[in-house]
Amino acid sequence: MKTIYSISKHEVSDEQIEKDRLFKVFVLGLPRSGTSLMTSICQTLGVNMIHTTENKKDEYDKRYKEKFGEYHPNESGFFEIGENFLEHYLEIIDKPYSGCKMIIPVVGLRLDIIKLIPSKVIMMWRDPKEIKESQEAFYSNDSDESYLRTALATQKVNLEKSGVDFMVCHYEKLVNDSYREIYSVSDFILSDKGHKEAVALVDPEKHRFRKEEIPV
């Protein structure tokens, strides 16, 4: 029987929690599907997450805050290709209750790597039309909605076939019903803290980024 840490408030010893958490957390999704937001949520819930924008955050603040508000572009400019995944993967191996994020277009055979260790994957799912609009606004290029739809469906099937423990988090629900969605994530990753703080991270006005709403 699964122990629900956050909702039922079962008393669980620190030793038992540590034993149960012998897994790594991976946030998986397409660019502009909510992976950065979910990474921050997992961090707030207590997971030692690696953020891809940490090293250049000050630089991004200076260059882009005026145009994009609080949004921070990733380490590759506006399009994250995820070239540092292996480095991040190796870094979290020996770090307790840790994780990092992956971007679907460059995930390749990484599910096979993830299967080598106990893992929990949170797959972000967003309407491909919204992803297309957001990508076109931020990356200044054309995006193929049919490709995005196929990429999402294919990755979900791959996860189902892999046997990896995963959940799908819908971006729309995360933004519009953040309390319920974050508690589901919290239970999935066996978090016992930071729930209210994680919910407070979600701002429906900020986490939308439809093409016509981007300031120019």
Predicted regions and their residues:
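PAPS-dependent sulfotransferase catalytic core
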Residues: M1-D94, L201-V216
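PAPS-dependent sulfotransferase catalytic domain
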Residues: G99-H195
